[in-house]
Amino acid sequence: MQRIGVFVCWCGSNIAATVDVKAVSEALGHEPGVVFSTNYQYMCSEAGQNIIKDAIKEHHLTGVVICSCSPRMHEATFRKTVAAAGLNSYMLEVANIREQCSWIHKDKAEATEKAIILGRAAIAKVQLNAPLTAGESPVTKRALVIGGG
């Protein structure tokens, strides 16, 4: 069975003003396969990344879910963080609860429920992920251009 850690980011008040991050963290902590769940003001900060690394080592996590801002913003940061802790960087899923919840909802209960749903989806996905490794393919350095006008 997978050992998944869930990390819910406040993004300062960007997320925490609209989403009850503590309720999200608590709800996702009860999902099957989740052995650790917490929340922190800025998961992308050095302190936040250290929380992730320490939890991976202490709880022997096999997968990580981060509920935060857009993956475009910090997915590379979080992949490096989990890799630095010894976990395959592809055993990470990011649930975008900033742009998809807090920035579009005014009702805190609705935004919180949607954040929990997005977190559950990310947990389900990381349970299906498999560790990947980067590979190389031979390339023949030739090209044929047809047309050109």
Give the ranges of each region predicted by the language model.
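Residues forming the flavin
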Residues: 1-149
